[in-house]
Amino acid sequence: ACKLGHNYSASDSLFFSNCQGENGEACAIFAGPYTVTHHKSTLLIAGMFSFMNAGSGSNQSNHMYKLGPIHQGTLERGAKTTSDSYILWPARVGAFSLVMGRHVNHSDTSNLPFSNLIEQNNTTYLVPGVNLRSVGTIRDAQKWPKRDQRTDTNKLDFINYNLLSPYTVQKMFKGRETLKNLRYASGELSDIYSFHSAKIRNSALVKGIGFYETAIHKFLGNSVIKRLEGIDFRTNEEIRARLKPDTSIGSGEWVDISGLIAPKSEIDALIDGIESGTVNRLKYINAEFERMHQNYYTYEWTWAYDKLEEFYGINPEKITAEDIIHIVEKWKEAVVGLDRMVYEDAKKEFSLASMTGFGADGSRLEKELDFEQVRGDFESNPFVTAVLKHIEVKT
């Protein structure tokens, strides 16, 4: 279900399921699932991408005019580029981040996912975590499964669509720690903080810590609820027994191998098997990927269980019903808080300034009526009603 057409030019590149390439150009790219580029002026070169949307005129350079075109870069899953954006490789952009402007200072924001990278006067400004409240990010996560064009019941690419997973949440843990360390090192009253070659404004840093903490509360709370739901517990011992993971697989670092999210230990074991010759057929490799994909939630719980003590300061082996209630209350606050932020973000699309008429002329009232006929009014928008329903259910 990969579509390349309308004079799309690609060389030395690999495209996976549900990629779309039209009009533009690709050279030496690894295009994971849902890498989409539609514009004639867009060049993707020497990079790894997945769940990515390239704006018109987006391009990168893998050549610094010294030792030849030897550099490469990565836009992690869900990254987007705006029109006329530019990145000088080597660089790495964190998951679900937005790149706007020209970036030449080789930033690595992989541990600050859901961020905006904005260029002002040749300087990269980083706004960490802000896309967690973006209606665009939520819409993207909802649309990808719906746009899966594969018709065969036996799907060869194992794709995990989860926005919050051990892969992204482990980066939030690191990002939260990084931001706290920056604030400690430079002082709470600094206007600007320096991170690698990027700048972070004070207000953005403080909000970023809050965004990451909210998302971590949401993920860990959700994991605990899923683990305990549907069972009546009479004692704390029963709760502790149920919380114990079913396997040790899942602890430690997780990786996203272009769609499949899995523990790094399992990927390393597969690589060792290939190198030693014990895994010597493509069908065996695919069977391993399928096993990891099917056991995702089992492995995810092992990871989440390990994080309970680090984040909440609660030893899972001594956890009580009161502790669970505390975690669930924090989870509810996080879910409803994020929903309200997404709701407010969606509201901007329906502000008077954003309302455009669809004719050649017309008064302000006619423009508003035009907009309403085409887009509907705010409160009846399907996405908005879904968010409001979600808030109502959770409260």
Predicted segments with their positions:
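Glycine-rich hexapeptide-repeat left-handed beta-helix
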Residues: 3-184
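Terminal amphipathic alpha-helical/low-complexity segments used for targeting or macromolecular assembly
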Residues: 110-395
